[in-house]
Amino acid sequence: MKDQRGLYYFPFPQNKRIRMYVREKDGDIWFRLWNADEPRLWDEHGWVPYGAVKRAESMYQGKKFDPGQAYDLQLALALIEEE
């Protein structure tokens, strides 16, 4: 999907108010979260390269949040390829 902010997918399909935007830059895939209920997140948090997501995964082991679901590399690549 695409809107004025760019390409996106729903990282939590049951919640259409949260979107994960994706782009390719400098040979890496970058992610940026947008939440309709917390619009300040868009301004406060910039684009995150996938490499940084992978490095941070260990901090979330055993916790409620799963970065692997939210930051879906395969889905991001498919969206970018479709574009």
Region roles according to the model:
Residues 34-83:
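Mixed-charge, Lys/Arg-enriched low-complexity segments
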